[in-house]
Regions:
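N-terminal membrane-targeting/anchoring modules of bacterial envelope and secretion proteins
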Residues: 1-249, 258-259, 272-291, 295-298, ...
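Asparagine-centered strand-capping/turn motif at beta-strand->loop junctions
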Residues: 257-265
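Short beta-strand/loop motifs in extracellular/secreted proteins, especially
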Residues: 264-268, 309
Length: 370
């Protein structure tokens, strides 16, 4: 009887204690739709109001919890607030009002979360199912980068618990914008195989905001096209300069400039593709370019026939994968190859002989008729 009583008491104790622990844990999410554009400026100043003590993101920091508290935070939001705190610009050039508000919000966040559990969402808070279908490897990047950024801003280690379980919502990104996302993602992935720069990794992670459920139709279109512009500018920092050249002999060397505007050295190769058979040229093997510098290559060409042609110059990595868009080298061949000359003279001579023969026949035929 005593054993039964003890068992009943134990069950009653478990019933009241375990749910209480769950009930006393407050989960606070700090997420927001993106405000910062891919060039670093801000679309508007709406985030300032959200960060105020009375705002959507400020209130949770002022509320005293009744028990334990778990914070679920998007590192992309902290990056935006940090950019505001350091001094920021609006895209429309209007005065900003949120620098001090952002500074105070970050300081308050570090203080109130210091003893609490913090879980980092995948960077940019993307739709998890859509990210898995689009690029599983990028979702892993979003998760690790999101963790890195939250730890950086809070200046401490946080829970290694996956934020995938905390992500909710469905993105309504249409097929056209999904295709643009994929193209930009692939372009930055290829660039990162050559350029090991923080800004390339950051921009690659920032593409996750395009998959965010927090964006409405207008926002999705705006940020998708803004991302394409930003990625194009980043790709242009490593480029082959287009140009016009003339070859006046059977062989000649063309000076082609390759520029690296990143703060890190890179190793690249260049694939050269003539669009017709007037010239022949070989690809350029891998070579190094220093940080923020340019290299001029002297590329040998062999001319086959006179006339104009275009050669596509494409930067590649060591595996031969294309990096960035191709540049156009306009080549004008002005010399006559001896083989072409012999062929032309021979053809003219044959035409002359044929015409002379035809004339003789006509004269003879005329005499016979008389």
């Amino acid at each position: 009887m005593r054993k039964i009583s003890s068992l009943v008491l134990a069950l009653i104790f478990s019933f009241f204690t375990l749910p209480q622990a769950v009930a006393d844990t407050t989960v606070t999410k700090l997420i927001a739709k993106p405000h910062q554009l891919f060039d670093g400026t801000f679309r508007n100043d709406e985030l300032t109001n959200d960060l105020l003590p009375t705002g959507r993101l400020g209130k949770p920091l002022e509320t005293k919890p009744k028990g334990l508290r778990t914070w679920v935070i998007d590192g992309a939001l902290l990056d935006e607030v940090s950019a505001m705190a350091a001094g920021y610009q609006l895209n429309n050039k209007k005065p900003t009002t949120g620098q001090q508000v952002a500074q105070e919000w970050l300081s308050r966040l570090k203080l109130v979360t210091s003893g609490d559990k913090v879980v980092a969402l995948p960077y940019g808070n993307p739709d998890i199912d859509l990210a898995k279908r689009s690029a599983p490897s990028e979702l892993r990047l979003y998760s690790t980068y999101g963790l890195e950024r939250v730890e950086f801003h809070l200046n401490r280690k946080i829970s290694a618990e996956s934020g995938l379980n905390w992500s909710t919502g469905t993105s309504k990104l249409n097929p056209l914008l999904r295709k643009k996302y994929t193209q930009n993602r692939q372009a930055l992935t290829a660039l990162s195989s050559i350029v090991n720069a923080p800004e390339v990794k950051a921009q690659r992670a920032k593409l996750a905001v395009l998959l965010s459920p927090s964006l409405d139709k207008k926002d999705r279109e705006f940020f998708s096209y803004n991302a394409a512009e930003g990625v194009a500018q980043t790709l242009n920092r490593l480029r082959v300069s287009s140009g016009k050249y003339q070859i006046a002999s059977e062989t000649g060397k063309v000076p082609v400039t390759v520029t690296n505007d990143f703060d890190v050295p890179v190793k690249v190769a260049v694939k050269l593709t003539p669009l017709n058979s007037r010239v022949q040229v070989s690809n350029v093997a891998e070579f190094a370019i220093g940080a923020n510098s340019r290299t001029q290559l002297s590329i040998p060409f062999t001319a086959i026939a006179p006339g104009a042609t275009t050669v596509l110059a494409q930067i590649t990595n060591k595996d031969g994968e294309f990096v960035g868009p191709a540049s156009k080298l306009s080549i004008n061949v002005t010399f006559f190859d001896s083989r072409v000359t012999y062929f032309t003279v021979g053809a003219a001579l044959l035409l002359f002989i044929a015409a002379f023969t035809q004339t003789i026949r006509r004269i003879r035929r005329g005499r016979h008729e008389k």
